């Protein structure tokens, strides 16, 4: 697939996420995606499948936010099968504290699916979030 097609896949998934369907993004991840969350937070590490990433990071974060984190696209940069998606995640922590994190996700596509990704983010903010009890 072309860089433009990969960009469209991400844009469409984010549009769905913004309407209340965050699972749309996770559906573009290959079942055996290799996804790394940088840092030393409770959700940092390398996940070797879509389900492991959802279980090990996404759900843990989701249990500590009020509602969902809404993505605001900053920009999407593409070259060949590589794509960098910079975005702001906006929401509220379970205790009512505003949550505003800037993310940069570097991804590699193959046949329309993300096969590798690295998530860069404000890890200090994630530490604060992870200190909250599950909601």
Give the label of every model feature segment.
Residues 1-31, 131-135:
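Short, low-complexity N-terminal intrinsically disordered segments enriched in polar/charged residues
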Residues 2-5, 58-135:
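A beta-strand edge to alpha-helix "cap/lid" segment located at domain peripheries
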Residues 10, 24-29, 33, 53, ...:
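Hydrophobic pocket/interface hotspot
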Residues 12-15, 43, 116:
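Short, flexible active-site loop motifs that bind/organize anionic cofactors or intermediates
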Residues 25, 30-32, 44, 96, ...:
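Generic secondary-structure boundary/loop-capping signal
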Residues 30-79:
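A solvent-exposed, acidic/Ser-Thr-rich amphipathic alpha-helical stretch
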